Amino acid sequence: MPAGRQLAFVQPVPRHLVHRASVAEVFVTDAVAGEGDRFLVAAQWPRDHALYHPDGSGCADPLLFAETIRQTLVFLAHEYYGVPLGYRFVGRDMDFEFTERSVLKVGAVPLPVVLEVSWAWADHRPPQRYGMRIEAVLTVGGVPCGRGSLRVVAVDEKRYGLLRRRAGRPASPVPPVSPVSPVSPAGAASPDGLPPGGAVSPGGAGGVVSPVSSGGAGRGVGAGRLAAQRVGRLRAKDSVLRPGGRAGEWDLELDLGHAILFDHPTDHVPLMVLLEGFRQLGYLQTSEGGAAVPHTLAGASVACLAFAELDVPVRLVMTQHRAPADAGGPVLLRVEAVQRGVLLSTASMSWTAERGVPVAAPGSA
């Protein structure tokens, strides 16, 4: 770290540099370049958040770490490596885990965290295609407490159009999130963070798909979705799961009007929306069926294989549920996201019990 240069937690970085429309959803506050391709990145996690709220034991929501990793890569790409604004970021894989959750307790002030980041180029063919990967160690108060990684490619409009056509969809016009106006022109969409899949994006041809249920025509948004408490959320609108047509299957409930999951218009299902679906299904599986205490997400590894469209049902299928090998051990889950028979994404998750927190009965206040 350069002499005399300390990380600042005073204000968020410009929102367009992390592909967010709302300033309130920007967690990264600063970055300092070190030797080689190494950085220290500062972020501030809120004491509370409508979607990413503390768990029953008072620790910060695990997906705050995932979103901070995403924002970190996008910010470094634009600010330090010259990836042009307006390029489409396509997610390949993400993983994260926690090694010491005690330091993640939410206190009387927002939680300052630091990511020790290493950057590497991968599958890199600039200037049309930038392939990049970051590895990050999460620290709080100087204590390492987690690690994670993210790999993406960023492509120009021509190559993005080719990727979309391979997926059977034309690329819709999606200008970058503006640093000036928080509202896109009528009929236009703004790029979200990182789409899932080896090439993933939009739902409708040439524009933004209207908010509809992933369950198909004839259903309103929210119809039949699981109660928020059953999936570990506080608000009804934050539940993204509906029972599927067969045992072990659930439908992803998409509400494009959700102010956090769909921070701005998009033409595909974003990675963070899929991750939220995986997380909620994991909570449901580990906290019901006789569990003595609720569980929290201790780690996840997500592989992105194909674009998830907005106007076709996305089904989440539980393919593995492995009980702890010993008392206090993690529950291991594997989930697949499927659309029209195409495997979109897979997630392997590790869940650990929240000590001293009893499970509430489904539907109780």
Please give the residue ranges for each predicted region.
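Hydrophobic residues on conserved beta-strands that form the core of alpha/beta folds
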Residues: V28-T29, G91-D93, R147, L297-G299, ...
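Active-site helix/loop of acyl-thioester processing domains in fatty-acid/polyketide metabolism
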Residues: A60-G86, V269-A292
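One face of beta-strands
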Residues: F65, R92-M94, I134, E276-Q280, ...
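Hydrophobic beta-sheet segments that form the core/acyl-binding groove
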Residues: M94-G141, L297-L343
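Non-catalytic linker/capping segments at the edges of enzyme domains
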Residues: M1-S57, V153-P265, P362-A365
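Ordered, small/hydrophobic-rich secondary-structure cores
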Residues: S57, F65-W121
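Mixed-charge, glycine-accented linear interaction segment located at domain edges/termini
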Residues: H124-A171, G328-A365
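Acidic/His-leaning functional-site neighborhoods
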Residues: S239-A306, L310-P313, R334-E336
